């Protein structure tokens, strides 16, 4: 599997990497930014997460208003993760009912929410590797302009 493209504007990095990064920024520059005010239905930790992460995402230039449902999903799952963790801290991983021990359902919520956060966070470009993937998507438009016949002797 080939290495994912790198997002960078550092002059010490390769020229093609810098050009791809610039192209992606230019493509998204005119798009509407995310509202820094959380949707009204988000409360508590979800609202805090939205208001913390959206300024960073807007500044990054890789996320636009069309991505608001992904940011909302991230914020809601973060709140679920925090609430489930509080349950585990209070009740424990297992609880006793009668003579039997049962796994705290919050453990499953932590597992599920963590996976969603990792996946959606990656989709939003919150890891270096996922940011590099965004460049590849921006370059896919170039294929339409490529002279494939000329490239392959046709």
Question: Where are each of the predicted segments found?
Answer:
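Generic secondary-structure boundary/loop-capping signal
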Residues: 39, 54, 60, 107, ...
């Amino acid at each position: 599997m080939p290495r994912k493209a790198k997002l960078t504007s550092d002059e010490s990095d390769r020229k093609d990497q810098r050009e791809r990064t610039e192209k992606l920024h230019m493509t998204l520059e005119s798009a509407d930014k995310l509202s820094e005010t959380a949707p009204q239905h988000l409360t508590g930790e979800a609202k805090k997460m939205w208001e913390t992460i959206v300024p960073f995402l807007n500044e990054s230039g890789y996320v636009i208003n069309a991505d608001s449902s992904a940011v909302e999903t991230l914020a809601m799952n973060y709140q679920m993760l925090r609430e489930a963790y509080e349950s585990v801290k209070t009740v424990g991983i297992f609880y006793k009912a009668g003579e039997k021990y049962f796994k705290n359902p919050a453990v499953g919520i932590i597992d599920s929410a963590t996976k969603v956060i990792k996946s959606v966070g990656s989709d939003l470009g919150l890891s270096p590797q996922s940011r590099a993937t965004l460049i590849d998507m921006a370059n896919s438009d170039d294929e339409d302009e490529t002279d494939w016949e000329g490239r392959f002797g046709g």
